[in-house]
């Protein structure tokens, strides 16, 4: 048993039972974005959260324990993602990454945007030309220190 197997079981059960991430998030009491990341193996659940997720997805006690282990975050199976939607994000960073970096540095100074003190919100934005995906990323600015 390992974390990847637990993630695969969660995805399989989600499909067969028609479970929505929003429903899981409501039961856990956190955002759909964070809970989805946790269920996909990218975040760590506490014991209570793992028990709730375990009940929804029919996980054993051992499988629930795996949800409480700190994962290897950002561990995609290939260097360049092949899934079209994930690849678009890769492409966005390749095209706009230097622009984002320049504008953040111009506004805040030399530093980084945290992915630890971080939140995101994904919503559908109706548009007569075709609905749009509205993604808001919010990370704390962390300046580099001098020493």
From Swiss-Prot:
Cite the entry's keywords alphabetically.
Lyase
Q: Does the keyword Lyase apply?
A: yes
BP GO annotations: cyanate metabolic process
InterPro entries cross-referenced by the UniProt entry = Cyanase (IPR008076), Cyanate_lyase_C (IPR003712), Cyanate_lyase_C_sf (IPR036581), CYNS_N (IPR048564), Lambda_DNA-bd_dom_sf (IPR010982)
Give the catalytic activity. cyanate + hydrogencarbonate + 3 H(+) = NH4(+) + 2 CO2
Listed EC numbers:
4.2.1.104
**Superkingdom in the source lineage:** Bacteria
Catalytic positions are: 88, 91, 114
Stored Pfam families: Cyanate_lyase, CYNS_N
**What job does this protein perform?**
Catalyzes the reaction of cyanate with bicarbonate to produce ammonia and carbon dioxide.
Protein name per the record: Cyanate hydratase
Q: Which organism is it from?
A: Albidiferax ferrireducens (strain ATCC BAA-621 / DSM 15236 / T118)
């Amino acid at each position: 048993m390992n974390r990847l197997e637990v993630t695969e079981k969660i995805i399989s059960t989600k499909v067969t039972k028609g479970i929505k991430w929003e429903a899981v998030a409501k039961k856990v009491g956190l955002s759909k974005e964070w809970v989805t990341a946790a269920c996909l193996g990218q975040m760590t659940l506490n014991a209570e959260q793992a028990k709730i997720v375990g009940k929804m997805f029919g996980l054993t006690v051992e499988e629930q324990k795996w949800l409480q282990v700190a994962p290897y975050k950002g561990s995609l199976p290939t260097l360049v993602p092949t899934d079209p939607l994930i690849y678009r994000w890769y492409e966005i960073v390749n095209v706009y990454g230097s622009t984002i970096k320049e504008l953040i540095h111009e506004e805040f100074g030399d530093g980084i945007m945290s992915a630890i003190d971080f939140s995101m919100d994904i919503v559908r934005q109706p548009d007569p030309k075709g609905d749009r995906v509205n993604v808001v990323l919010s990370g704390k600015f962390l300046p580099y220190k001098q020493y």
